C-alpha cells in the first residue's frame, strides 16, 4: 500500500501485521475446540457459586432446564458467529470484529476482551490459590500471597506458548475435575432426595442460572474466533461448540448442582470461609477425610482455564499493540492479575460475571447482526469507525449492566433478568435497525 497516497484508507498497525492461519495448521474439533472449551466449564470457578441464588430459589429440575437453555444460548448466540468468522478468515477476534466496528473502531472490543480475560485470569488464580490453602488447612495471608505469585506467573508463562499447548494439556487435565465432580456428587448422593429449596421463586432460579452461565462464558464466546481460526470447516465449528460448550454446561452444571443439593439435604452447613452453604465447597467438605486431596486436584485442574485466559488476553494486547513484545505485555498483565488476587478483589465471582456478560454480550449481538447482514460471510474490515456497532454496544451495555447503574428504579433492575441475554438482543436489534451500508472493504 502506498503510504504517500492520501486517498488510501488508514490501516491500523494490528491489521497490517495480521496473517491468516493457513488450513495446513488446523486440526479436528476434538483436538482443539471441544477439549479446551470443556476444560473451561470443568473449571471449579464455573460452578463454585452456581447454586447461590439459584438452587436456593427453585427446584432442581428448573435449574437443570435452565442449564440446557443456557448451553444452547451460549453456543448459538455467543460462540457461533465469532467462530465462523474465525474459520472463514483464519483471523482472531481482534481482526474479525473490524467488520462490525471498523478498522479504527476495532481497538475497543479488542482491548475490552483482553482486559476482561485478564480479569478472568485473576479470578481463576484466586480460586486456585484459595483451594490450595484449603487443601493445606491454612488461612495464612502470607502463604496465600506466595502461592498466588507462583501460580500466576507460572500460568502466564504457559499462556505465552499458545493455544495448541493449552489444548494438549486440556486433553489430560480435563479428566481430573470431571472425576472430582463425580466423586463429590457420589459422596453427597444420599441427600439429593431430601433437598427442599428454602424459597419458591422458580423464575428467579431460572434466570439466575442463565445470567451466571452467560456471564461466565461471554468472554470465551467472543474468543470463539480464535478457536475458529484453528477449525478446518463449519462442521468442526459446530461439533466443537455443541460438545465442548452446550453439552459440557449441562453435564458439569447439573452434577455440581446435585452435589450441593445433596450436601444441604443431608444437613451440611457453610464451611469456614464460604459465603453461604450453597457454595460448592460445602459439597467438597462433605467428602470427608479425602477433601484435602480433592481441593488439591481441583486446583491443579485450574491450569487449563488460567492459561486459556492469559492466552486470550496476551493475544489481544499483542495484536492491538504489535510493537510491544508479547512476553512483556503478558507479564505486565500477570502482575496486575496477581495484585488483584492478593488484595482479594478477584474473589467477587458473581459481580465479575455480571460485568463480563453486560459488556461483551452486546459486542456479540452486534457481530451476529453484522454476520446476518453480510450474508453470513467474512467480507473484511470496514474503513474507519462503524458507528452502528458502537451505538449498539453502548445501548446494549447499559441494558446489560442496569443492575449496577446508580439512580435506576429498582423495578427496572428487577425486570432486567437475564440481563446479559437482553443486552445481546438489544444490540442485535439496534444494529439491524441501523443497517449500515455494504462494507467498504480495506484491500490488503
Residue ranges and their predicted role:
Residues 27-47, 185-191, 198-261, 286-307, ...:
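Hydrophobic, membrane-embedded alpha-helices of multi-pass small-molecule transporters
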Residues 38-43, 69-78, 113-122, 176-187, ...:
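Selective recognition of specific alpha-helical transmembrane segments in multi-pass small-molecule
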Residues 51-55, 83-84, 127-138, 150-173, ...:
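Membrane-water interface regions at transmembrane-helix termini and the short interhelical loops
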Residues 67-101, 108-116, 436-439:
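Juxtamembrane transmembrane-helix boundary signature
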Residues 146-188, 200-201, 241-245, 353-365, ...:
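Membrane-interface loop-to-helix entry segments
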